[in-house]
């Protein structure tokens, strides 16, 4: 799905942009296949295995799976990054997978990601030129630990919960405050990148 200039203006105004249904169904299913076979099993298999991971637990890019590699370097995501940064000279700093299961604690304090993959001291925000993203590969409900994003200039209490259909993506600045939330549902999983 092409990300429009209007959507990118929203990103620059609020510090993040949630794009629902960014991935096609085939791209979403291919990414889930990669996660469930190379990183972490789906909830049912995880519980049947006494909450043990029976995969290779390959969490970092590059993956030996075309579906995961494709979504990491998705042409429309790369295009949006180039337009945000104003250059085709972009670098992927990190790609990693995450899995949250029912019954585990996941809540974090609100924080920024500046400092991850950065050697220097904290600097003033620079017009959102340090871009990060979250993919949600399965549907995320309020019960399945949605990521909480805080719009620029707002207090943490005014967060936006990333309750989205599977295949959605959130672009955000490393200066955008955000936090994990608890998985309050009694079953299920939330795979993310």
Predicted segments with their positions:
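A structural signal for short, well-ordered beta-strand segments
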Residues: 94-97, 133-135, 193
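Short, charged/polar surface micro-motifs in flexible loops or helix N-caps
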Residues: 77, 102-105, 140-142, 169, ...
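Non-heme Fe(II)-dependent double-stranded beta-helix
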Residues: 1-14, 20-124
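Catalytic core of Fe(II)/2-oxoglutarate
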Residues: 145, 155-193
């Amino acid at each position: 799905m092409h990300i429009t200039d209007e959507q990118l203006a929203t990103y620059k105004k609020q510090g993040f942009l949630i794009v629902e249904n960014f991935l096609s169904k085939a791209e979403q299913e291919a990414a889930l296949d990669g996660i469930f076979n190379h990183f972490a099993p789906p909830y049912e298999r995880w519980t049947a295995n006494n909450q043990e991971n029976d995969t290779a637990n390959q969490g970092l890019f590059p993956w030996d799976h075309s579906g995961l590699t494709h979504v990491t370097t998705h042409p429309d995501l790369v295009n949006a990054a180039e337009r945000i940064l104003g250059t085709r000279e972009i670098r992927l700093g990190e790609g990693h997978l995450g899995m949250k299961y029912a019954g585990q604690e996941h809540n974090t304090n609100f924080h920024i990601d500046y400092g991850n993959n950065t050697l220097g001291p904290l600097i003033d925000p620079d017009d959102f030129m340090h871009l990060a993203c979250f993919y949600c590969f399965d549907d995320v409900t309020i019960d399945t630990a949605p990521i909480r994003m805080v719009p620029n200039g707002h207090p943490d209490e005014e967060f936006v919960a990333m309750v989205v259909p599977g295949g959605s993506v959130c672009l955000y600045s490393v200066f955008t405050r955000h936090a994990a939330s608890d998985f309050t549902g009694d079953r299920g999983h939330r795979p993310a990148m």
